């Protein structure tokens, strides 16, 4: 896996998402309900469904550590596995590494621009779902943010240096106008 271009001509990106990617690869399996659903589509033969029923990733993963600067056209993750196994994990790896690397990179740029002043993450209200909020806050922390308004992320990572960063609700704005 590699990327071709750094967003906004930034020179480099910050690797993030590896922890979730490895966890996904380790735990990927197909439940009976999954197999039954695929069987109901009428396009998969029994041999393939049996393969999925017993699936366990057998490949090797080589990756750049999280928080490391990465550059265009250089491998950030390599999967050495049978093609079918690599294909089964490809989409999740792309969406996870791309999403978190983008956020970690932007956070890192903001932190560097702040020149030593603390930067806190408040992205949960704009995230596309609860998992994206937690993963995004985690990525911002990897990028250098000192804390998050996402209480769940703070609980999981213990990343906020303060008691609670909180957030500023839209209703507060309306009341003060």
Positions of the model-derived regions?
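N-terminal, charged/glycine-rich beta-strand/loop interface patches
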Residues: 26, 58-60
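Buried, small/hydrophobic-residue-enriched core segments of structured protein domains
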Residues: 5-7, 43, 49-58, 66-177
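Intrinsically disordered, low-complexity, positively charged segments
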Residues: 1-43
């Amino acid at each position: 896996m590699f990327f071709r271009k750094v967003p906004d001509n930034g020179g480099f990106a910050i690797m993030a998402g590896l922890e979730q990617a490895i966890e996904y690869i380790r735990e990927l399996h197909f439940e009976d309900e999954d197999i039954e659903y695929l069987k109901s589509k009428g396009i998969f033969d029994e041999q393939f469904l049996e393969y999925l029923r017993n699936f366990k990733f057998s490949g090797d993963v080589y990756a750049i550590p999280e928080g490391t600067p990465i550059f265009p056209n250089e491998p950030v993750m390599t999967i050495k596995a049978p093609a079918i196994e690599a294909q089964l994990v490809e989409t999740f790896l792309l969406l996870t590494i791309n999403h978190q690397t983008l956020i970690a990179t932007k956070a890192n740029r903001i932190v560097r621009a702040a020149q030593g002043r603390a930067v806190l993450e408040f992205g949960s209200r704009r995230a596309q779902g609860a998992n994206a909020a937690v993963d995004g806050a985690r990525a911002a922390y990897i990028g250098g943010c000192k804390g998050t308004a996402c209480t769940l992320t703070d609980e999981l990572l213990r990343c906020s240096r303060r008691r609670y960063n909180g957030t500023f609700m839209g209703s507060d704005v309306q009341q003060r106008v």
